[in-house]
Amino acid sequence: MKNLYLFLSIFILTISTSFADGHNIKKDGFLSKKFKVTKLSIIEDPTNKIILINNHGQSNFDGKQNFCTSIDQIRNRVSLVGEQINGKKIMLYNLCAHKIEGDMGKKWWFSKKPYEGKSKLDKRVEQNLELVEKLVSLGVPRKQIFVTGHSCGGLTTLLFFSRHPDKAGGGIAYMQACFDRLSKKYKVSKLGLEEGLAKFKEKKPAQYDLRSQYNDEILKNLKVPLLAFTHPKDPFEGLTSDWLDQIDGMKRVVISKDYTIDGKKCFKLGKNKSDKFKVKDGHSMDQATCFQYYNPVILELSLIHI
C-alpha cells in the first residue's frame, strides 16, 4: 500500500509539473501584464477598480501541493488586466491555496470513510471570504469584486456564492471539477450519465456522496448570476455538468466540440511565446490563448454588475 501511495504521489507530481510548463507561481498577490506579483497592501483609487480573484486548480482533492498556478494556466486571466469598464480598471489577484490541507488530508481520496470536518474546498471558500473582506476594507466596493476559478477553483467559486451570495459582485467558474476524471474514467459518453455515476458511486462511495452533497448545496442555494464554462471533451466533468443548467441566473457556455474556438486551433503558451503546445485535453481549453475570444463575454458580466 505504501508503494501505491508513493507511485500516486510521483504520478501527480509529474502531471503537475507538465502542466506547469516550468513557470510556477507560488505566492499571492496582484499580477501585472508581465506576471509580476505585487503583495496586497494599499489599493490606489479603490472605488475605480474591479478585482478579479483567481482560484487555481488542485493536483489532489484534499492535500497540499508544491505551487498554486503557472504562467500558462493564468495567461488568459492576465489578458484582462488593465481593461476598463465605465472608467474602472481591472486588477487580477492570484489567491494561492497550495499550502491549505483539508481535515482528512490527501489519503482520504483512497478511503471509503465519509468525510468528516472541513475539506480543502471548504477552507478555500473561507479563504476567499477573508480576502473579499480585506479588499472591501481597503475601499473596493463589493459589487466590483469577482470570484473566479478553474477546476477545483471553479467548484470553490460555486460553493462561495452558494454560502455567501451577497459578499461579492459575481463570479466565473471555469471547468468546475474536483472529483477526478469522472467523464473519462467512468465512460459517460458510452454508458450515459446515470450509469457512469453509478459506477463512480460503487467504486468511491464516500467521494460520490461528498460530490453530491456539494452539488445539492449549490443547486439549492446559488442565486447569484454567474458564468460557467465547460467543454464536452473535459475528462473530469465535461459530460457531467448539465446540472448547472438548472441554476437560475447561471449562464453556462459550452466552449466548443473540439479543440478550436471560432475556427482557430488552440494552444497554450508558457513564459515565452516559443513555449507553445497544443491543447489535448478539454479541461485546459480555458487556458488556451484562443479562449480570449470569450473576453468580451467576461467583460460583459462585469458591466452588468457595476
Question: Which functions belong to the PLM regions below?
Answer:
Residues 21-45:
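N-terminal cap/lid segment of alpha/beta-hydrolase-fold proteins
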Residues 43-85:
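Short, surface-exposed "cap/lid" segments of acyl-processing enzymes
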Residues 69-81, 230-272:
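Active-site-adjacent alpha-helix of alpha/beta-hydrolase-fold enzymes
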Residues 92-122:
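Cap/lid segment of the alpha/beta-hydrolase catalytic domain
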Residues 112-138:
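Alpha/beta-hydrolase active-site loop
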Residues 134-137, 143-192:
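Primarily recognizes the serine-hydrolase "nucleophile elbow" in alpha/beta-hydrolase
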Residues 178-256:
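The feature captures the conserved acid-bearing segment of alpha/beta-hydrolase catalytic domains
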Residues 251-303:
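C-terminal catalytic histidine-bearing segment of alpha/beta-hydrolase fold enzymes
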